[in-house]
Amino acid sequence: MDLFDCARSINKSHENDVLARLTTVWGEELDPEHVLEEYPRPQLKRDNFTILNGYWRYAITRSGDMPTTYDGTILVPFSPESILSGVERQLQPDEYLWYERGIFITAEDYASLSSKKLILHFGAVDQTALVCLNGRKVCTHTGGYLPFEADLTPFLREGCNSLSLRVRDASDASYHSRGKQTLKRGGMFYTAQSGIWQTVWMEWVPKNYIRKFYLTSDYDKGELHIRMLTHGTAPVRIQVFEESNCICDDSYKEPVPPKKKESSASALSAAKRNPEGYSLSAIIRIPKARPWTTEDPFLYTLKIQFGDDHVESYFAMRSFTVEPDEKGIPRFCLNHSPLFLHGVLDQGYWPDGLYTAPSDQAFVYDIRTMKELGFNMIRKHIKIEAARWYYHCDRLGIIVWQDMVSGGSSYSLPLVCYLPTLIPDISGHLKDNNYKLFGRSSKKGRNEWIKECLDTIDYLYNVPSIAVWVPFNEGWGQFDAGRITKLIRKKDKTRPIDQASGWFDQGGGDFKSVHNYFRKLDVVKDHRAFVLSEYGGYACRIEGHSSVERIYGYKKFSTKEEFSKAYRRLLDTELKPLIEKGLCAAVYTQLSDVEEEVNGLLTYDRKVCKPQ
């Protein structure tokens, strides 16, 4: 172990730094009149929608009362802390952030409100939101990473309508989930952001419409299982396309219960009431199913007609499991074939947009570049990304390990991070029911996190490329990992679980998951599959492409040439020989630099790729 490198990696806050104004090529080319105009939800897509991104009025106040005047305009969906928002102002925990814009309802639309609804969607708002229309409360939402929606229909009037949003964000001053955000940025923790940070849109739907559905591909049986939640009931038509060829087209005037041994192309159960409306289930048989792989990421097109509601989606036929190889070593398997996962850690930060990518093509660039560098997996690190990022992973063929977002009150970094780095074995003897140690004294905070964890699985369940759920990372806000693993397994039986990435292993889940930045890489024998869920972290600051002069990383190099040689040597001489010994996955830190943490393969502005 290099104690000097270890000591230099101690995290320090530098909130008074003035960060360099780095921009990406997509941010430089951004047209404020056409911001992120792609349909934001590719797996439940409708035609009749309106994107509400663009300029809104905003105000930052000390009072919770709606302002009579506004401070200016903000470019949605960029948070006010970001360059692209045009505001560049940190929202404090004791402040309110207000948004306002108009919505115009035509006489024709207003006259037909008895037969249709107008649904408003927020991709994500950090952290607590109050939505009002024409001064009337529509809904509230807490949680900065998950989408929410509201039915505007009862609040509409003909002509101009005023849509407003009030936001508060405690960031790391509370137990709420916040990931890497901190009000005192520095080291491996980054600038806090707030407010709207994903696309806002609205869509007209018929009175009876599809609310959501769950898609489960049974790779072994060649079946797609659909569970659909609806408002109201109506005839259903389901179509599946393999490229342009329709391989299933079934219509139902009235739902029928499935038989135990159904021989037809599909079966649909009787609709039955549930708290969210009606529930319908279908089994679709996929003839000669074409498997999804990282080399051939084939996606089937799914079209569902529910009365007058028409939606389009997609799915893939694949399975993710952990199985023993011919030597009895547990391995990660894609479609029952062992696959070594060469992964990279992705923080999901941008210099000009912070949490918000400046364009859809920026997502594509990151994913394609990582594939070109030889990676077949991305670990999305304690952030939930916009739905289109997952769509691009699905279609481009890269596997995703999805972290839950960390939260909890303040915890001791020396005890939670530094000590386990120096003495890894010590963390295995600490139980995570010591709530105070891990910043989880608040029962309300623990319950809130559990709900968010299960809601995250609910939201991302249909994503074909997501292979593994990661509830906890390095003990940050960790608690009751054994119980949480059981809850996740009950919610989703189709994906393995990395119960505690890094340390504070409670012995559960499907992986023995280790972080190793300062010791010689090795394999730890365990009954579970062994993964290096973080390693590397080599730092190389590129002049003109870094946020600050300061360097944070785990081993420092002065030039791209030095970095490249060390990086290749790490992969070829230390990492690859471990695969035969039992290593089944490894996650290199990281995809890009973030602020002073310059251990990315790409610079923060994505303009320089360091490996040569």
Summary of predicted features, one role per range:
Residues 5-8, 12, 20, 57-63, ...:
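Accessory beta-strand-rich segments of carbohydrate-active enzymes
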Residues 56, 135, 200, 300, ...:
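Conserved, mostly hydrophobic/aromatic
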Residues 154-160, 229-325:
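Extended acidic/polar, glycine-enriched regions
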Residues 2-49:
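N-terminal pre-domain segments of enzymes
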Residues 213-214, 291-294, 303-370:
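N-terminal carbohydrate-binding accessory modules
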Residues 122, 224-232, 336:
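Aromatic/hydrophobic beta-strand junction motif of beta-rich domains
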